[in-house]
Design a protein with these regions (language model features):
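Short, conserved loop/helix-junction motifs that constitute active-site signature segments
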Residues: 2, 88-93, 116-118
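Flexible "cap/lid" loop of the alpha/beta hydrolase fold
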Residues: 4-37
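Conserved beta-strand scaffold positions in the cores of enzyme catalytic domains, especially
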Residues: 10, 98, 123-125
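Cofactor-binding loop segments of dinucleotide-utilizing enzymes, especially the Rossmann-like FAD-
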Residues: 15, 101-102, 128
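Conserved alpha/beta-hydrolase catalytic His-Asp/Glu region
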Residues: 38-90
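Short beta-strand/loop motif that positions the catalytic acidic residue
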Residues: 91-92, 98-100
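Conserved alpha/beta-hydrolase "acid-adjacent" motif
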Residues: 104-111
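Catalytic active-site module of serine/aspartate enzymes centered on a nucleophile-bearing elbow/loop
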Residues: 121-155
Length: 155
């Protein structure tokens, strides 16, 4: 579809692979809007929850979430439920790396979609981790993992 865009290596962390999932859209929209309204009412609680999940970056993440407008949240929910997966050649697939935490919801779709749609892509599960928790636990170690992936031989 976008063959004018080229890449050497692409690393996806916890990316949604849900397609045409109206029920997921309704559920996530409801849940995110409810959490957003609660965060607006009680910033301190939102910050505590985010810090408990993501460490010191949680303050910035909570403030960013609070600052979002509801229309943006609805768009995020929709985009996560209706992903338009491109067709990739086997060579393009070999340049893709998909990372998921074993405790994250998007792993359900990844386990179904990746072997069928992108069988040549690398697929790794971080055992014991939730969504994007591997990144925030130790950013320096994670950056080394990314560096190793980017400079690996199948690029």
């Amino acid at each position: 579809k976008y063959k004018d865009i080229g890449f050497g290596k692409v690393v996806f962390e916890g990316v949604s692979l849900w397609t045409k999932s109206a029920l997921l859209d309704v559920f996530t929209r409801y849940l995110l809007l409810k959490k957003h309204r609660k965060a607006i009412r009680n910033r301190d609680l939102a910050v505590r929850k985010m810090v408990s999940l993501y460490g010191e970056k949680g303050v910035m993440m909570a403030d960013s979430f609070i600052a979002m407008d509801e229309e943006s949240i609805k768009h995020i929910s929709h985009d996560c439920a209706f992903v338009d997966l491109p067709n990739l050649t086997p060579e393009e697939q070999k340049s893709c790396v998909f990372f998921y935490g074993s405790k994250e919801f998007d792993l359900i779709a990844a386990k179904k979609v990746l072997p069928q749609k992108y069988p040549q892509a690398k697929f790794h599960i971080w055992q014991g981790y939730g969504h994007c928790r591997k990144i925030t636990e130790n950013p320096r170690a994670y950056s080394m993992i990314l560096r190793n992936e980017i400079f690996s031989s199948n690029c």
